[in-house]
Structures are given as C-alpha cells and as structure tokens.
C-alpha cells in the first residue's frame, strides 16, 4: 500500500531489516521529517506492524537505531537488578518508570481518599443532621464563643511587675536556671 511512496532507509538505519518495515519508514519520512519522532508509530500505530515492538526492537535497536538504543541503555542499567532501580534514575524505558510512577501515586491516593470516604460523621448521606447531633453532644454552646473576646490590652510595665512579683514569690529560680 505504501510502496509507491517508499524511500530507502536513511543513514541512521543501515540495516536492510529496518528498511523491510516499509510503511513505517514511509511514515517516518512523510510525517516527522526525521527518523526519531514518529518512530513510536511503527510499534503502536502502523497497521502493517501490529506485533509489539519487542521482537523488532531487540535485534535492530541495540546498535543501529538511535531511538531504540536510548531505550536499551536504560534497560541495560536496569537489567542487573530485577526492580530496575538504576534504570529509574536514568533515562529508562517506560516499564521501570511505571513501577515507580504509579505505586507512589497509589500510596498517596489511599491516605488522601480514605478520610473523604470515611469521615468521623459517617457517610455523606444525612451528614448535616448527624453532625449537628454530635456537635450538641460533644460541645457546649459556650465553647463555640470566642474565649479571647473579653481580653483587654495590657502595658509592658504591668507585665514586668507581674513577673518580678511571681519570681520573688516562688523563689524557684535555681530550679530552672543553673
């Protein structure tokens, strides 16, 4: 289907096997203008290459293709450890990023989500009625008033006199300051 518009492989793709992909190379030349950006179209979007990019990328990508070479550099770092810890810190394939990208997100989601679903007032239905009953049983109306409303301003002289009186009255300076 894409053979009339087919171009020979560009210099970063010297292998004849990569040129055999046909429609994918045509997509690269027509859309991206370069070999790198539309290359995911070969693995995901191209109708001629429905197999996943794994079998195709392993023989060719490690040496010739710059895109797959970048991916495999992360895979090489991640291969010594099964969890892919070093691969997650470098530019790595999406697999090791998903391991660390989604699991912390889920851990953050559960503590944030659980208080919303299970509030101290029960479920969301009828919450206003139950909240008013619990407020009346736990709190007195005097607690809802401002406790600092009756305060009056005090000068600094009064405070210093008060502290000097209490210190001489208690006589426990040595207990706190040695």
From Swiss-Prot:
Residues carrying Phosphoserine: 39, 46, 79, 81, 92, 103, 114, 123, 132
One Gene Ontology term, aspect cellular component: centrosome
Chain intervals with Gly residues compositional bias: 17-34
Coiled coil: none
List of residues that carry Omega-N-methylarginine: 56, 116
Chain positions with Phosphothreonine modification: 50, 119
Biased composition (Polar residues): 97-121
Domain of life (superkingdom): Eukaryota
Compartment list: Nucleus; Cytoplasm; Cytoplasm, Cytoskeleton, Microtubule organizing center, Centrosome
Residues found modified as Asymmetric dimethylarginine: 36, 58, 67, 76
Descriptive protein name: M-phase-specific PLK1-interacting protein
Organism whose genome encodes this protein: Mus musculus (Mouse)
Taxonomic lineage of the native organism: Eukaryota, Metazoa, Chordata, Craniata, Vertebrata
């Amino acid at each position: 289907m894409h053979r009339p518009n087919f171009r020979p492989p560009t210099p970063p793709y010297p292998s004849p096997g990569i040129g055999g992909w046909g429609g994918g190379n045509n997509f690269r030349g027509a859309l991206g203008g370069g070999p790198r950006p539309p290359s995911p179209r070969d693995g995901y979007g191209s109708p001629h290459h429905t197999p996943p990019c794994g079998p195709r990328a392993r023989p060719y990508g490690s040496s010739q293709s710059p895109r797959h070479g970048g991916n495999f550099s992360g895979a090489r770092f991640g291969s010594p450890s099964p969890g892919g810890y070093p691969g997650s810190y470098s530019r790595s394939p999406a697999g090791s990023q998903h391991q660390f990208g989604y699991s912390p997100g889920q851990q953050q989601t559960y503590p944030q989500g659980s208080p919303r679903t299970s509030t101290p007032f029960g479920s969301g239905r009828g919450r206003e009625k139950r909240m008013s009953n619990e407020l009346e049983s736990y709190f007195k109306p005097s607690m809802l008033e401002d406790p600092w409303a009756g305060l009056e301003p005090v000068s600094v002289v009064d405070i210093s006199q008060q502290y000097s009186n209490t210190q001489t009255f208690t006589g426990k300076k040595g207990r706190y300051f040695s």
